[in-house]
Amino acid sequence: MKRERIRRRVAALDTSNQIALFGQAPASIPEARPGADSPRKQAPRFEEPDPRLIRINEQRLDQLLEQVGQHAPLKIRAWLGQMCFSEFEQAYPPGGRPAYAPRAMLGVILCGIMQGISSLRELERFARTDLGCWWVSGAIMPDHSILGRFIQRHGGLLSEQFFDQLTHKVLKLTGSGTGVVAGDGTVIEAAASRYRQMRAEALAQALQAAREAAQGEAEAGARVEQLQRAQSILDSRREEREARGKDASGLSINAREPEAVVQPQKDKQRYAASYKPSVLANDKRVIVAAQVHASSETAVVEQLLDQAQGQGKIDTALFDAGYFATDVIVATAKRHIELLCPEGQSQGSDWNKHSDKRLPKSGFDYHAEEDCYRCPAGQRLSAVGCYKGNASAPAYTEYATRACAGCALRERCTRSAQGRRIKRYAIDAHKDALRAKMAQPQARQRYAQRQAMVEPVFSTLRHRQGLQRFRRNGLAAVRVEFALHAMAYNLSRALAQLFARFINGLLTHGHPSLRKVAALLSHAVVAMSLQRGSTLCSAALHAR
């Protein structure tokens, strides 16, 4: 049987514009004009849903929040909408899948912290279940890893530029400034187990064991690097302590969190690896500056003052007796800021409370015209020598007397066979002037407002925002975490001030029946949390 031939269509190709492999190329190829048909540079895209499109039972979400008296989320979203996030957006590359908008991400984090939620997994659950958070963020639902990467990527902005921007906004909302600020600090435990604290001997043994097990194992090698870093930090701390003439044999460190210092906690009953955050607050209890140091509250005073002066001029700074130090006096004098700070552990009417076991240096009166000291027993201490000082130790003049042998106060004054000796430094003239100022009734009265300005700040951070312990490792990460808590606290203060203004309006211009209600609310709000106060503020604004 003869097969039929299959006929296929043959396509004719136009080869007139083609060039042979070894043929002669055209003399020139026309260049495209720059920018004519070139693709434009893509800007990063962000996912920021409109919460006005969210409906629950055919009712808009904002209407539902107003109906139940939850106006705080409405206010927070409006305030965040007035902030600038361009620096955040510049950190994202163009193209690809749209990222969650920085405004929405920060709304989730701050709203959660205001309600005492700071764990990343708890924030993930909060973003999925809280209606107020839906309105602030547009109902985005990031998981804990996305939240963690956002904080890590923008840590520098969150703790510096954006903190200053939000603080400026809150100062305008509260109608307050930085004329008078009060400073304080506390100690907060680090994210490290107290059972992993090691002294120098145990650390050396652990490092030796890790080195023996590190042959060919990447994880063991990382452990060696961690222990080496901890040993280096511990050695530097021991050298610094010995240079000051103190015993360093009892120093310990946590290898998992070596930047944290093992120090006594607030209850004075235990030691743990921890950090010391410090703040400056104004008369409306708004945090105008926040810093964190590993072990010192006075070491960050200069940074606090500079950060606060970025918001406005500081006239007076109030610090407790723990800040009666050279660094603080010099920092305030250099910036022409009036300092009110007592010496010793001032409590009640006793402004210079010291231990009865030893007479302090402040109990000796210096007489500049005679260049001598007078001790509490009336004896004269004359200059017996001078020290010129060096790069590590300041110069001083030493004063002494031979009348200590038969003095009735010797047991309380000195145990030295040579008698009591007083060293006078250049800074002592400023300390004497500060003591004289704090002895005046007007200065005491002005200083008395410090406790109400700054003491409630850390109480709120600990008990209302859940800052009993840091969750991130390393000093840099801890600073970012504390800045987030400070920003959430400031938003709560702005909401509380709105509530206070509404109550004052009712007390001044309201109907007599409304005045009674306002009086009851003003007494009740003292015992309420800021979260509850924000809700009352929302209800008050709605009623108005």
Region spans (language model):
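Hydrophobic alpha-helical membrane-insertion signals
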Residues: A11-Q70
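Anion-binding and metal-coordination hotspots
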Residues: K2-R8, A12-A25, Q42, F46, ...
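Short, low-complexity intrinsically disordered segments
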Residues: R77, G132-C133, S349
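Short N-terminal secondary-structure initiator segments
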Residues: G23-P44, A72-A91, A222-S232
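Basic, short loop/linker segments at the boundary and entry of helix-turn-helix/winged-helix-like folds
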Residues: L65-L110, Q115, A426-H430
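Short arginine-rich
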Residues: W134-G138
